[in-house]
Amino acid sequence: MITIPSHEFTDLLNEISKKWQEEWSKNRIFEADPKDQKKFFTTVAFPYPNSPFHLGHGRTYVTGDVYARFMRMKGYNVLFPMGFHFTGTPIITMADDVAKGDKDLLDIFQNIYEIPADVIPKLSDPLFMANYFKEDIKAAMREIGLSIDWRREFTTIDPQFSAFIVWQFSKLQKKGYVVKDTHPVGWCPVHNLPVGMHDTKGDMEPEIGEYVVIFFESKMGALAAATLRPETIFGAVAVWVNPKATYTVAEIWGKKVIVSEKAAEKLKFQTDVKVLEKVSGSDLLKIVAINPITGKEIPILPADFVDPTTATGVVMSVPAHAPFDYFYLKKAKVGIEPIPVVAVEGQGDAPAKDLVESSHPKNDADLKKLTEQLYRLEFNKGLMRSDILRLVKDELRAELSVVAGKQVPEARKMVTDILIQRKAGTKMLEIMNKPVYCRCGNEVVVKILQDQWFLDYGNPEWKAKAKKLLDSMRVIPEETRKDFEYALDWLQKRACARTRGLGTPLPWDKKWIIESLSDSTIYMAYYTLSHKIKEFGLHPSQLTEETWDYIMLGEGDVKAISERNKIGVDALQELRRHFTYWYPLDLRHSGPDLIPNHLSFFIFNHAGIFPENLWPRGVAVNGFILYEGKKMSKSLRNIVPLRKAIRTYGADVIRIALSSLVDMSSDANFTEAGARAIADNLKRFYELMQMQDGSTIDGTPEKWLRSKLHRLVRDVTPLMESMRFREVINELLFNLSSYINEYLEMVRSESREYNRDVIREVVETWTKLMAPFAPHLTEEMWHQLGHNTFLSLESWPTPDNSKINDQIELEHEYHKLLIEDIRAILNVYKGKPSSVLLYVHDGSLNQVVKSALDVLNSGGTMKDFMQKNTPKSKEEARVLQRIMQYVTEMPETVKKLIYSNVNEMEVTRKGVPLLRYKLNLEIEVLAYTQEVKQKLNKDALPYRPAILVK
């Protein structure tokens, strides 16, 4: 076998990749058109071209391509297109940062992405940036081997695509799904624009949640304490403020209140705020507050853990049910006792106290975990204590009596309603996953937006359709379905237009531009005919609402539409034919961060516009990529550009690492050591292809290897179908390599050469199975094996079940077990061994062993076994006990051999050549007899021979 040095193999991989990318492009093998063949239409989210691709981007695209290539080999006519998302604020904001001379960004562009110095200033022009990075991303996609039909490429600012978006929004408006309303949104206070996931740094979706604000009256005004657990107000024994923060006395919510300075600034975006004066947190410690439910005076205490930027910056202290509160009250030694409010069966009166004192938290992070644990427990299992009414002031007791004994969720709503009715509380909105930053660098706040256009995802009719679509859709992995269900439930009104950014104007209110997560929900439909729109030279003015109604929905008179829009009937029918052939979309690939936004919007918009037969059929979600165990980030300077990684390791190595290191839903950790291990295994198979000599002997080793190969084909095919790529690669790259090593040892043990035909069969089959993962190397190997077709277009292997031989595989596994047992004895053997004697049982106990296995398999016990096989003597009882102990530890291989009824002596003798070769000792196989037992004082059982080392 020829051995190639590792560094030379990487160079070879890059040469091979370039060669076959050019061949695929030249021969246009991934261009897909309607034909008399079952179709498979798949897409991956098109990228924002505001920076080059890094390793983290690659996983979703490669995973999508692996599956597309697999389906192509399974006989499907596969369409995998790509476009580019120019609209929205990501590109404009990044260009602004270049124009401002953002040092961190310029450093990353120059020193990590290696963008030429003369190009960087030009990136301040948004369109230059978009087009420059579009070409760079396209190059990365080609270099990583994506099997894309590039004829269909478009950008979201192409006028023809804008005409499609106009149609989409006109349909939604007519159905009542686009509304003008007042609603909370994430908001950039600098740009004065709504902010969604793709407008933020790190692509974080601003999650808007609700705090209940409870007014604790004081001589300076009401301390506005924000809480997520208003039902625990009965046990509030103090108010926390941050002594180092600045607070304001202000008129908010129609009364004089005290909130942090930061809170007052944020609340201006939700309600009227009039600041009267500023006070320090330490000044507030000099006054007392009144619990509005109990009427008791309670102290105001200092707490550095109170974040003045979160909610109101004022927190009530409930030490019975808040681990933070109990921990810090105890530390402050103020002598305040917890007051229990919520009861959980099996828990003490003050569960926060019990948790803290049993867990010994070392820091705030530990306290946060305990808090989440207790909050979850009490929310799900807690009941309001009946004795809380003794805490309530007289005038509220009757009104609050309904709360006693209620479950926590119900009590929470009741208490909130009563507080608001009594003007003792209100609600405020907050970014729950704060801090979230706009791409311009400013922190996002919540704004109550008036006269804004929204997609009304809370519309009951629309929501029901979306849920029906999800129910009909395949979700990979299935466990992410619950995340989709939660998102569809949670979504309400969503701002769908901006006054800034690239994009399509709202057709009925052109001062607004449709935002980037709203114009990217049904664009997959546009792929089906984008190349034909170019081919026919259609102008946006021809792509009217009735034109799209005909193409997408089959509505209208084609001749009349043709005449009015000056599009030939044949062209319209051709566009309709292409759309109806490819749609619905079969599979959509994306990341988990897009479930609560893009992927849910994708479901809603398809459900809202298209009939059920055109609803998407599936969605696949994969986890993120870590680099050497850490998230890639600018601050860590560990961003690895995708094109650089390809040059360093080879495209196929990167493809395998990105798609197959872990299960789909898990985050994958890319490491240099892991990449090298993948490269070494690829090299091993490439070198195996060079094994041209060998013999034509076709014996047991060949039958065994063919059996393992065809079993592997049979097993990995359903794994591929369910996108369990980690398990597939484990079989193809690691297990199959082990099988080949075992086969070569088997033939060497027979003092002969390998069979060249079986090696070729293994290599040919492997190239097909690995083609979706390592398309470049396998294409090269396929041609070196003498084929002149494109492997990418070959059929997926089918197993020959007649070649799967369970018995031969079992016998070989048994021989390996014997080797392990002998080695275990040799490890403790004193002296130099020369031979091993194996004394094989005569099989007289086989039926008894089967009986023990039957009892065990049916859930029986030793007692059941003894009743079934009544011993006639103490010796028989001892043997039966040994047998039962034996079968409880018996390997699966031996169990199968026991049931197969083959002759143990024959099976053992077949393994002698391999045992001799592996152990480098003489092996003798002898019959186990009573004389042997008495002479050697050794026991044997079926398939557990007595072993004697000489």
Curated annotation (Swiss-Prot):
Binding site for ATP: 634
Subcellular location: Cytoplasm
Entry GO MF terms: aminoacyl-tRNA deacylase activity; ATP binding; leucine-tRNA ligase activity
Sequence motif: 'HIGH' region, positions: 47-57
Motif 'KMSKS' region per UniProt: ranges: 631-635
HAMAP family, A to Z: Leu_tRNA_synth_A
Family membership noted in the UniProt record: Belongs to the class-I aminoacyl-tRNA synthetase family.
Protein name (database record): Leucine--tRNA ligase 2
Origin organism lineage: Archaea, Thermoproteota, Thermoprotei, Sulfolobales, Sulfolobaceae
